[in-house]
Design a protein with these regions (language model features):
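A residue-level marker of the well-folded mature domains of exported/periplasmic proteins
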Residues: 1-204
């Protein structure tokens, strides 16, 4: 609603910044499709510079950074910082209208104390990754290439909107499904300097 969203990381590592790159791409796609001008605070994909707590453990740091983002006008925050992200959720809960986008797992379920402010979550499909790896071994197809989770193989996904389903703009879920289809079919190519391809190389 404010026209500003925010993100921050725990430590500047590829496994963190790849989430932040994706969030930046999502904002850019929304602006393009909707003719909007939503501003992302806390991360610049082009320069790879942004906000970091420099810890994955100190929840107070998460609260501090989230407060900073909120004061700058962000009303949706995606903390990519492990337990530090829960500190951000605590800050968001104290500001009416501020929402959190969880990471790694569905925070609506894994952090139920904050479910009333969890808009959605970007999930890692750990169970699917384990299944695929074991199956590859059983089929004699296991190799040393790193497992890369994608929308196509179920290694990553967007969690349900849960309690916010009824208040979403009309047609939004259909638009998201269409974008997912574009990515899976290769019509929309998603890149990140933090990514690794299936051959073990670095991303673009």
């Amino acid at each position: 609603k404010t026209g500003k969203v925010g993100t921050f990381g725990g430590v500047q590592l590829p496994t963190v910044t790849i989430f932040m790159d994706g969030f930046a791409d999502g904002v850019a796609r929304y602006n393009k499709d909707k003719g909007a001008n939503v501003q992302l605070i806390g991360w610049d994909k082009a320069s790879q510079k942004g906000l970091f707590a420099e810890t994955f453990e100190d929840k107070a740091k998460g609260t501090q950074i989230a407060e900073q983002l909120i004061q700058q006008g962000a009303d949706v925050i995606m903390p990519v910082a492990g337990p530090v992200g829960l500190g951000a959720a605590a800050a968001a809960k104290n500001h009416a209208g501020t929402k959190i986008v969880g990471v790694d797992s569905d925070w609506y379920q894994s952090a139920p104390e904050y479910k009333d402010i969890v808009l959605t979550s970007v999930q890692k499909g750990i169970a699917r990754a384990v299944y695929d790896t074991i199956k590859a071994g059983a089929d004699g197809k296991f190799d040393k290439k790193p497992y890369v989770g994608t929308l196509k193989n179920g290694g990553v996904s967007l969690a349900p909107f849960h309690d916010f389903e009824g208040s979403l703009p009309a047609g939004l879920t259909g638009e998201l499904d269409a974008i997912k289809k574009e990515i899976v079919e290769g019509k929309t190519v998603v890149t990140s300097k933090s990514a690794f391809d299936a051959k073990g190389g670095s991303g673009k």
